[in-house]
Amino acid sequence: MEKTMGLSAKRSLPHYANERFDRWFSKHAVAGVDDPGTSRMPAIHTAAAITDRGYKKRGRVILWDDTFVRYHEPHIGIAAVKVLEALGFEVALVKNRRCCGRPAFSQGNLDAAANVGKHNVGLLNEGDHSSAILFLEPSCWSMFVEDYRELKIDNAETVANRCFLFEKFVDDLLAEDPDALQFEDRPATIAIHAHCHAKSIMNPAFMKRLAERLPGRKATVLDTGCCGMACAFGALAEKYDLSVQVAAHLIEKIDNQLPGTEIIASGTSCRHQIADLIPQLRRTRPKHMAELLAEALL
């Protein structure tokens, strides 16, 4: 890989999941049909999931299943669906969506990023004009709320106003309705690494508040900078050493946590970097906030 593609032999590669998230979601939607002898036809650009489980009904939300959730980390998408349905939302996915364009944008290929942006904004402007659009990956979310605007994509502003980071959306709802979710009470220590793209747009302090909505938990948002991975950057052989140097402060912070501390990181690149550089975490692995919440649900 290093000779043919320039990828560092020291860097692990993402694993492909046995089942794609969107395919799991399609089965999940069919399983939720009231009459098992029928199948519910999805809307043109969305596929509805289970809604009738006795939860308070709050309407529909659209979950943006980014590339890594779809192909590599479907368990994070499944966790998010579990939490959102427990809150009473009908969850939908966007059919025919394309990559948000972050890789192209980060490499300066603005035309390619604009093309996929126009496609995605067009999809989200058709049919359902009111549902919130939730993102699990901060780098995708920031494309929609910030970079599509800079690319001057038509209707980007309208769509951006409907886009929310999953964690912030859930925390805002629980601030208004603290009893909307019931969580297991158990003592645990949680350390949170906030994503650069999220920090550039909002104060990450809410993540501590959200984690501590789980009874018995004590959370800290680590005072850290970039993880040094930045998707393909940290995988390149010529950039690997620099990537590790950038991560040094973060890794030191995590190493200094109490044994058994749960590590939360919203970004897939951040989780990848942490797991690679702290081998003992590979058995417990860093988690997304959606997983922390879903695992604690009663």
Question: Model-found features: residue ranges?
Answer:
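Iron-sulfur cluster-binding electron-transfer modules in prokaryotic oxidoreductases
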Residues: 1-298
